[in-house]
Amino acid sequence: MVRTDRDRWDLATSVGATATMVAAQRALAADPQYALIDDPYAAPLVRAVDIDVYTRLVNGQIPVDVESGFDPARMPEAMACRTRFYDQFFVDATRSGISQVVILASGLDARAYRLGWPAGTVVHEVDMPQVIEFKTLTLADLGAKPTAERRTVAVDLRDDWAAVLQAAGFDKDVPSAWSAEGLLVYLPDDAQGALFDNVTALSATGSRLAFEFVPDTAVFNDERWRSHHARMSELGFEIDFNDLVYHGQRSHVIDHLARDGWQSASHTAKELHAANGLDYPDDDIAAVFADITYTSAVLGR
C-alpha cells in the first residue's frame, strides 16, 4: 500500500508491520541458535501481533532454500549489529549521567524492560496510540516489569508530539538521550527536518542522539533488490519498502544537525559488522545496503 500524508496503521499493517518485522529479526538474533543479543520479549511480542510470516519466522518454520535467497543467518547478524549499536548508545549515555531517555517510534522496542538502567532513569516511549497500547498490554500479560520509569507518549510523530512529550513530564532543561531507530526512511524530507528541529529545541547541552539513515532510498528500487524482494514474496514476506519509504537522498541530515550544534560520528553497516566481529555478506543484495549509516551525536551548542 502506497503511503499518504495522513495514513494510519497498527502493528500488522503498513509502516507498523515493519516494527513487527524488526522485532522478528531481533527474536532471531536472541534465539539460542545465534545468541547475539539478549531480548526475551521480541519473540512473544511478534507472536502476539500474529502476522503469519513473522510468527513462522520466529518459530523456525520458514523453509531454507538457497535458491530462494533466504539466508537465516543474515537477519540475526544484521539486526544484532543494529541492536547493539543502540543498546551501547544508551549504556554510554546513562553512564555519562544522562537520566532522561526518549525512544522515538518505539514500536515493539522493549529496552525499557530489558536494559539495566541506572536508578532514576526515565524512559519516554513515543509512538502511535494503538502501538503503545498493544505493547503495554502484551508485556503486562507476559509479567514483564520495566527496569526504569517508563512513560508512554501516545502520539503520531507527524502531529505536535513535542507538546505531548512535555506534558508527560519531559524536562527540556536537562540533558537527554534520543533514539530514532528505523524511523527516518518513513518520513518525508521536510518531516525529517522538523523532527530534528524539535529534538534540538528540546535538548539541553550535552544531550545525545542516535539514528540510522539510508543515504539514498533509490536502493529500494534497485534491480538487485527488486529481484530479491520477488523471491522473498514467494515465502510470504510481503512488505514492499519501495511503497512505504519516502524517496530521496538523506545524507544531508548530518549537515542539518551540525548547523544546530550537534557533533556526529558515523559508521556504515559494513563497518558496524566488522566492529562486532561479523563478516559483512559478499553478494549483490548486501552491496546495495552496505552504506546504511549509523550515527551518534552530542549537542555542544
Curated annotation (Swiss-Prot):
Q: What's its EC?
A: 2.1.1.-
Q: What's this protein's function?
A: Exhibits S-adenosyl-L-methionine-dependent methyltransferase activity.
Which SUPFAM superfamilies does the record match to this protein? Answer: S-adenosyl-L-methionine-dependent methyltransferases
A GO molecular-function annotation: methyltransferase activity
Keywords tagged on the record? Methyltransferase, S-adenosyl-L-methionine, Transferase
What name does the UniProt record give this protein?
A: Putative S-adenosyl-L-methionine-dependent methyltransferase MUL_0450
Q: Provide one Gene Ontology biological process annotation.
A: methylation
Per the record, the similarity remark reads: Belongs to the UPF0677 family.
Positions annotated to bind S-adenosyl-L-methionine: 127, 156-157
Which InterPro entries would you find in this protein's record? Ppm1/Ppm2/Tcmp, SAM-dependent_MTases_sf, SAM_mthyl_Trfase_ML2640-like
